[in-house]
Every structure is written in C-alpha cells, then in structure tokens.
C-alpha cells in the first residue's frame, strides 16, 4: 500500500454502546494500514461514550461528531460526519463491527474510481460478543475459527468467511449470489461520490437507508465490487428496539421510488433541495 495516492477515513456510527465501540476501536488501533481519520457519527449518546472516545484520542486520529438524541436519526448524523470528514476515500461501518487487522488495507487495495466496495460481516452470538477482550482483538485470536469454536460457536458454512485464505476469499467473492450492495456495516467509496448523491436520505429511519444510498450511487453510474469474503469484521450481537414495521414499509416505498425514478440526489440530504 506504499503507492496509495489517496487519504482514507473510517466513519463509525454509534449510539449508547460504549462497551461495543471500545472493542471496535481496539480493532482500528491494530490495522496494518492506519486510517488518516476516524469520524465517529454519534446519534446522541450519553457522556460515557464521549469519555471513551476521548480516551482513544491520543492513539487514534478521531473526530467526534455528535447531535442531541431525537430518536433514530442515523442518516442525519452520517451526513454530518460526511461534512466533517476530509479523507478522499471513506469506509463506513458501525459500533458493533470489529475490523480484522487487514480491514482498512483491503478496502484500500480494491478502491477504484467509478466503484464502491461491498463488504459483509460475520455475526457472533451474544455470549461470545461479551467474551471478546482487548488481547483477543490485538492477537487476532477473535478471528480464529479454532478459538471461536472453543468458545462455543456453532459450525456453519458462514464460517468460511474466517478461513483467512486470500485466494479462497477472492473465489468466493466471485461466485457468491449475494449482490454487491451498499451495506452500512461494511462499505466504502469516494467522498466526492457521496456528495454527488447528496449523502443519505434523512427522511429514512431504521431499515434500508444504506441500501437506498447505494441505489442512488448506481443511478449515478457508479458500479460495485464484492469483497464480503476479503474485508472481514466481526458483528457483535445487540437488540434492535428502533426497528418498526411502519418505518420499514416507508423505507421500502422510498427505495422503490429511487430505483424507478433513477434519481441520484436525495432532496433531504446534506443539502436540502426544494
């Protein structure tokens, strides 16, 4: 990655989950390629999250972007984080996704103008999520199937994501039937492209606002690359009290209109379009 001619940033969304966020930040301390900036998009967390972020400030290039808690406003805080960011290339992820040591390096490796990257995650049950400590992240033991099985992880085909073989990962990226969509927990693209589509649609709440952002990138002519087996993060378990049938139905209708109309700029994004 010595020849990289662009800066890279990581945007991490968070809300009142300092214990999970701490594990994630341990992961970013341990990257083979260090990000030039980390922007925390904080949807109104309490003071314990601020204190945690400040404790990492001397070790990581962190910016804390916060607004008052007014319910689930992830799209709005992501737009504020976009404005606060300065890196050419941005990786978007969440407070519950611990990155493997080569996570940033992998996104940089596959970055290409005219494309965004679609990563995935390996979901952990709550008991193992709670067990993971700093040494497990630093040593990369937490990404070892042998260690995870010893902690009680059930074997499944999804475990192939953690095999760590680059050739196999590339093969699986090519044959997976999963579409290369914009996934809020693990996706990356050029900052200028995010501004060209006016960021995230602030009319949307939980459920699909990331996909709709990606669908407008497609409308713009941006293509996607599948890296779900190469850019690995561990997804820590959590509840979703903000998930409602009404918001999901509303968001599906917005996404359907985005695909049908071919719009690129959301009217309710970084700038408000009349």
Language model regions located:
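Cell-envelope/extracellular polymer assembly enzymes that use nucleotide-activated donors
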Residues: 6-9, 37, 212
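Acidic donor-binding loop at a coil-to-helix junction in glycosyltransferase catalytic cores
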Residues: 185, 206-213
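Glycine-rich, basic loop-to-helix element that forms the pyrophosphate-binding segment
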Residues: 68-85, 102
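Short beta-strand/loop segment that forms part of the nucleotide-sugar
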Residues: 35-44, 65-67
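Short aromatic/hydrophobic "clamp" motif used to bind/position activated sugar donors
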Residues: 90
């Amino acid at each position: 990655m010595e020849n990289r001619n662009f800066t890279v940033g990581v945007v991490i969304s968070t809300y009142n989950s300092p214990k999970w966020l701490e594990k994630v930040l341990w992961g970013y301390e341990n990257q083979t390629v260090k990000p030039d900036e980390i922007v925390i998009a904080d949807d109104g967390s309490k003071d314990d999250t601020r204190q945690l972020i400040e404790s990492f400030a001397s070790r990581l290039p962190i910016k804390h972007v916060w607004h008052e808690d007014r319910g689930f406003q992830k799209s709005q805080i992501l737009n504020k984080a976009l404005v606060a960011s300065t890196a050419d290339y941005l990786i978007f992820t969440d407070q519950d996704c611990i990155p493997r040591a080569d996570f940033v390096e992998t996104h940089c490796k596959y970055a290409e103008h005219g494309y965004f990257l679609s990563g995935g995650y390996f979901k952990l049950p709550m008991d193992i999520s709670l067990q993971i400590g700093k040494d497990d992240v630093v040593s990369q033991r937490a990404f070892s199937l042998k260690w995870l099985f010893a902690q009680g992880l059930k074997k499944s085909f999804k475990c192939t994501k953690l095999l760590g073989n680059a050739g196999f990962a590339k093969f699986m990226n090519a044959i997976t039937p999963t579409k290369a969509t914009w996934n809020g927990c693990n996706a990356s693209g050029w900052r200028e492209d995010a501004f060209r589509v006016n960021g995230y649609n602030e009319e949307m709440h939980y459920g699909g606002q990331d996909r709709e952002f990606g669908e407008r990138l497609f409308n713009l002519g941006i293509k996607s690359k599948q890296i779900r087996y190469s850019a690995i993060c561990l997804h820590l378990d959590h509840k979703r009290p903000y998930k409602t049938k009404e918001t999901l139905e509303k968001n599906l209708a917005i996404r359907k209109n985005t695909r049908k109309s071919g719009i690129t700029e959301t009217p309710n994004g970084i700038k408000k379009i009349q």
